């Protein structure tokens, strides 16, 4: 086998009819984990239902339906390979909880693939004031997705088909709006494709001989190519934050007979290993780690990205819970957040948000109501510059700096210190009404917590 390929995560974004599903389906279909038998079964069903023209999207729809019914489908189905990487598609929007998932993200996307439809009138609809193209791109930027690829889809339905003029017109427009959001167009490949016919997806298309290819300039090295697959192959792989202090938000806490208390979660930053003395916030409980396991094998050390279970001494299941954060007691231990300041972008709130509003925040694995105690300023969401001091309220489309107070103990961090613990979704009326990035946190001083005997010995 040789060295395993690097794993990267992508998120596919764009307006509802841009052809995200077809494009994604095509990649999975041609380079991915779906076995031929499953594909043939899907194709036959698609034909029978008169959806033959829709086969790639159909593949994706089948996968989505199974995923939504809670059938844990083989996650390999959402993976495909490039020459250098194993690529996992974290999620494609269209899912009601897409935004929430992207924020509380079980995994941070390394790159966003923005799909725009080039058909006459379609591009304009997606990029208009209420189109999702800008919203998704802004979201990706706000949540720290640093890299982007733009796939100009449906080139087969421009007038005339495969029109160079239309492609140029569209990339000029896209460059202008992504620049406003904060992306540098020089670092972004723009690829004209047909997700359905396969033009420029895996092989250069004969239909667009005018297209000389994409090229990008960036400090990590320049790159160029012709196809979407090559653009994906040029993503800069993520640096794992092993050098940061430990942060591990708990997904669950189990009580296992004969072993004891086993918290489970994903290491976001730092490392965790047996013998380490850890502190759980906001409960302020300190104890020793006995063992660390992943996939039923014990590990000498777990790193960022690893989903692990670990056994702790003399801590009851009542002491800690989902949403608690495990940290190294000797290296910037996590503490309870008394209040925090955040920049929020209001997205689809039907009314307006004023001081006193108390919705539920989803931040890492925590799910806790927080009160908007004070609206400090209204800012221009593109530049971050202040527009107004102490606004009375914020409505859809506004961005502001706000002071939030949790209604129950909570542990969050500033985005610049620990990114995965510093972004949140504001949920109300069963939808995401705002997203936020935490600027600063007022922490409890952390005195008077519970310390187990084994932890005290090691102090």
Curated annotation (Swiss-Prot):
Keywords on record: Cytoplasm, Elongation factor, GTP-binding, Nucleotide-binding, Phosphoprotein, Protein biosynthesis
Domain tr-type G: 5-242
Keyword Nucleotide-binding: yes
Region G3, annotated ranges: 91-94
Subcellular compartments: Cytoplasm
Superkingdom to which the source organism belongs: Eukaryota
Stored Gene3D superfamilies: P-loop containing nucleotide triphosphate hydrolases (3.40.50.300), Translation factors (2.40.30.10)
Annotated segments matching region G1: 14-21
Chain positions found as 5-glutamyl glycerylphosphorylethanolamine: 301, 374
GO molecular function ontology, one term from the record: GTPase activity
Gene Ontology CC entries for this record: cytoplasm
Region (G2): 70-74
Any Pfam family: GTP-eEF1A_C
Segments of this protein annotated with the region G4: 153-156
Region of interest: G5: 194-196
Family: Belongs to the TRAFAC class translation factor GTPase superfamily. Classic translation factor GTPase family. EF-Tu/EF-1A subfamily.
Function statement: This protein promotes the GTP-dependent binding of aminoacyl-tRNA to the A-site of ribosomes during protein biosynthesis.
Protein name: Elongation factor 1-alpha 1
Species: Oscheius tipulae
